[in-house]
Amino acid sequence: MNLEKIAVINITSFGREFPKHLQELEERVGPVDKMLLPADMDGEALASRLKGYTYVLLGNYPSFDEAFFSRNQDVKLIARHGIGFNNVDLESSRRHGVYVTHIQNYVELDAVAEQAAALLMAVSKHVVIADRKVHEGNWNKDRQELMGFQLRGCTTGVIGCGHIGTRFAMIMKYGFHNRILAYDPYADKDKVMAEGIQLCDLDTLLRESDFISLHANLTENSRHLINAEALAKMKDRAILINTGRGPLVDEAAVLDALKSGRLSGYGADVAAHEPMEKDDPLLTCDQAVITPHSAIYSYTCMKNMNRKVMEDIYCMQRGERPVEIINGL
């Protein structure tokens, strides 16, 4: 049997919670090497590092660009262990005959939608600040500073109404009796409206929402969709949540809005630059609650994601096309 090598790049959870997945790949395919590579590793160095590997299971970084694909003829499949694929040059991969796949967002929808709701509750109730006070021995000190917001009966705006955005909307609608507004130029209007979601333009959503949650894809048109101009249109003391992509917001403008009190709070599971540096200005603000792109880390979600990328490899072994190909091969 001709063994093929697998590189698992920057997916620290793979094989840890479900060691049988790692064992299965080694038995059915070949050696599996887990690697932690720098986010800024250039394509030439990456091509050299992955010489001799047939399959790559890829986390959120580093980036696979033309410099990689033009120098490495061994890799035949890059399976993204996630929804987004901004770290892979799809045109270059297609031109060089490398399949690129990803996880469809229905696999992650519960985990990410629940994370968005958790961030909203943490921000609106000042959970992180309150917990810190108790741990510091300040149970009775300045509790009035923890004055938060009641979620019931408010208006929630959802930007990006795909599987995850719609699931989050349902949590807010049925869990907190919220009115739901949505902005999504690509939405299936009939399907969205059947869920009791009101589609509207972006300005209306910004103006009328108490809470705004971002679930859009990152494109050149959506980059910095929430900028200083958009923030100025929002309700005073609104709360912004981002579990989509970091660059959907202008983080400098968000920080200014938090400091001025224009924005009551910001909760995010993503950042403009990942991993965030510990001296990132946004981390100096108590009104910002940031988690390290960890929304998918539930046992159910991780198990299903692992199984999907493993099946992509098995398809290739059988001479079949893997599922959810995103680069047009």
For each of these PLM feature ranges, what is it?
Residues 53-131:
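Phosphate/diphosphate ligand-binding glycine-rich loop within oxidoreductases
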Residues 237-329:
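Rossmann-like dinucleotide-binding domain for NAD(H)/NADP(H)
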Residues 58-59, 81, 215-218, 243:
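Short, well-ordered coil/turn residues at beta-beta hairpins
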Residues 18, 144-236:
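Rossmann-like dinucleotide/phosphate-binding beta-alpha-beta segment
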Residues 53, 72, 208-209, 237:
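An anion/phosphate-binding loop that grips the pyrophosphate of nucleotide cofactors and donors
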Residues 1-53, 181, 190, 317:
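N-terminal glycine-/charge-rich "phosphate-binding" loop or analogous flexible N-terminal tail
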Residues 63-75, 221-240:
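Rossmann-fold NAD(P) dinucleotide-binding segment
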Residues 113-132, 174-178, 308-315, 320:
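Oxidoreductase and adenylate-handling cofactor-binding alpha/beta cores
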